[in-house]
Amino acid sequence: MNKNMYHRYLTLPFEHSMPKCYNTEHNDVDYHVQFVQKEWWDLRFIEWLKNYQLKPSNVSEGFYVRPNGGGLPIHNDSAVLSNIVNINFTWGPPTSTTRWWQLKNGSSYEIELPENTHIIEQKINPDVNIKQYLRAREEECDLMYEQVIHTPSLINVGQLHNTHNPDTKMGRWTLSYIILKSDNTHLQFEEALKIFKDVAYE
């Protein structure tokens, strides 16, 4: 049986508070992305990461996905395919999912050069890549894995992934922390499985 290299749930000793900046629904679009300032981070989570000699990047984003099939497009979070990992917290319906994809033979990635206005206007010096990502069209991909995200989760964001919210009434908010090691490099999924072996589960 193939090892799941996409997702794990996490058991944490606290319930992460929902950022107060998540106070507006954006149901006129499929999805909405915004920068989440440090003042909205949960300090208990930051202290918990320190126990593992880890820390969040200074770039943290929030995503809103509308009801009735809203979702992020298929993309990854790095300039090339990789196995970098984020920790996500999600508030919303118990049916919304994250899906992971693999490009079909003969298909090509699209290079995404985002404007990232929501990050640049914060006047910070990003400590991670925000300049280039990969995107793909669903018809050119095979679905590899899908999981309901309803509790804190390790998310492999180096692989192609997207979100889907089938709920008819409730939107989905996510806070995504980019996890860095003490040398400021991005934590890899395999490393995360070892580090969080006592609190990660499928």
What are these regions (language model features)?
Residues 2-83:
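Signature of the catalytic double-stranded beta-helix
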Residues 11-14, 91, 177-181:
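Short beta-strand-to-loop capping motifs
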Residues 58-60, 86-90, 99-102, 154-156, ...:
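A structural signal for short, well-ordered beta-strand segments and their strand-loop junctions
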Residues 45, 99-102, 187-190:
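Short, charged, solvent-exposed linker or helix-capping segments at domain edges/interfaces
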